[in-house]
């Protein structure tokens, strides 16, 4: 199995990417990795070349670049070359912690959209209080969605949750303003009716306030709603941890309490740590394309590689394609 990784993407590239790749190579004996980027920078952190290949390029896509234009014009950019490795059949999947918009463009224009899928979806795995997490899609790939798009998201998310996350008969919920039938705008009502007859375990509407409680294993929404929900959850978590730290450091007594509580607080932090859940998968493409978090450290990159490997090994893309052929809803 071979995975191509954009070694120039992300806030901590290439160091985090190289260290994460070497960790994955040690963990998985069947894995081969191609690091795409400036060779000099990669070799600075590469202590072992076992099953690791470097594809040199000086060009990269910057966060300030217009995504579509950059992908079309910067043919030798590290992200584009990683996607090209997949298109050419040299790699089974690709990963980047670079620009989300550019990776979506590279996925569409280089890797290509899966037959029968109208719009790809960006899907991270979000943490829950029980540590199990849930898959949410879409969180920004397609802000103006149609009912058929959300129907396909539900099916793709269900396949992923079962194959990669090992959840038998995963619960699929529709993000809405209330849990009762008939709630929401016209899009939500139409999607609800479609999902009731879908080949999935649809549990109905779910509200954003209940997401962290693990009310569903897969949460479906349009890209605009999903992006707002995602950033609200991230912001709330950061604010809570910041306030907690401020209070625990406010006096000598509270500092003593913090020392006693530290093991429990670390458990809580680990439960809510996005780095353990891998990256956000771009569903609806011909091969796995994973968007790692922009601030990924080496552990986050390792988790994204582990996630990608599972998608390839468990044949997630062929399974989604097979299910869609059996359910050609238009």
Curated annotation (Swiss-Prot):
Principal location class: cytoplasm
Record note on quaternary structure: Homodimer. Probably interacts with PlsY.
Reaction catalysed by this enzyme: a fatty acyl-[ACP] + phosphate = an acyl phosphate + holo-[ACP]
Heme in keyword set: no
Classification via InterPro entries: FA_synthesis (IPR003664), Phospholipid_synth_PlsX-like (IPR012281)
One Pfam family here: FA_synthesis
Presence of the UniProt keyword RNA-binding in the record: no
Any one GO biological process: phospholipid biosynthetic process
Pathway it works in: Lipid metabolism; phospholipid metabolism
Source organism, top-level taxon: Bacteria
Enzyme Commission number(s) of this protein: 2.3.1.274
Subcellular location: Cytoplasm
Protein known as: Phosphate acyltransferase
Enzyme class: transferase
Stated role: Catalyzes the reversible formation of acyl-phosphate (acyl-PO(4)) from acyl-[acyl-carrier-protein] (acyl-ACP). This enzyme utilizes acyl-ACP as fatty acyl donor, but not acyl-CoA.
Protein family: Belongs to the PlsX family.
GO MF term list: phosphate:acyl-[acyl carrier protein] acyltransferase activity
SUPFAM superfamilies: Isocitrate/Isopropylmalate dehydrogenase-like
Keywords: Cytoplasm, Lipid biosynthesis, Lipid metabolism, Phospholipid biosynthesis, Phospholipid metabolism, Transferase
Gene Ontology cellular component terms for the protein in this record: cytoplasm
């Amino acid at each position: 199995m071979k995975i191509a990784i954009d070694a120039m993407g992300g806030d901590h590239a290439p160091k985090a990417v190289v260290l994460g790749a070497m960790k994955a190579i040690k963990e998985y004996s069947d894995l081969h990795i191609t690091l795409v980027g400036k060779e000099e920078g990669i070799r600075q952190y590469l202590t072992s070349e076992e099953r690791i290949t470097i594809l040199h390029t000086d060009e990269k896509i910057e966060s300030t670049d217009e995504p579509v234009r950059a992908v079309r014009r910067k043919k030798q950019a590290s992200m584009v070359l990683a996607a090209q490795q997949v298109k050419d059949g040299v790699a089974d999947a690709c990963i980047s912690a670079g620009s989300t918009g550019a990776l979506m463009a590279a996925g569409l224009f280089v890797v290509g959209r899966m037959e029968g899928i109208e719009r790809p979806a960006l899907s991270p795995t979000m943490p829950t209080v029980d540590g199990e997490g849930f898959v949410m899609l879409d969180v920004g790939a397609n802000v103006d969605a149609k009912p058929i798009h959300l129907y396909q998201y539900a099916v793709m998310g269900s396949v992923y949750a079962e194959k990669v996350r090992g959840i038998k008969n995963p619960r699929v919920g529709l993000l809405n303003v209330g849990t009762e039938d008939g709630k929401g705008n016209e899009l939500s009502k139409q999607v609800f009716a479609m999902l009731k007859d879908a080949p999935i375990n649809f549990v109905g509407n779910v509200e954003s306030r209940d997401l962290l409680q693990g009310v569903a294993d897969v949460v479906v929404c349009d890209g605009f709603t999903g992006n707002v929900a995602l950033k609200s959850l991230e912001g709330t978590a950061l604010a809570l941890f910041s306030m907690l730290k401020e209070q625990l450091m406010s006096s000598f007594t509270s500092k003593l309490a913090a020392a006693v509580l530290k093991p429990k607080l670390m458990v809580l932090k680990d439960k809510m740590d996005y780095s353990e859940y891998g990256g956000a998968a771009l569903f609806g493409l011909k091969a796995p394309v994973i968007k790692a978090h922009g601030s990924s450290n080496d552990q986050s990159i390792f988790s994204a590689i582990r996630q990608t490997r599972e998608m390839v090994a468990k044949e997630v893309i062929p399974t989604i394609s097979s299910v869609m052929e059996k359910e050609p809803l238009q």
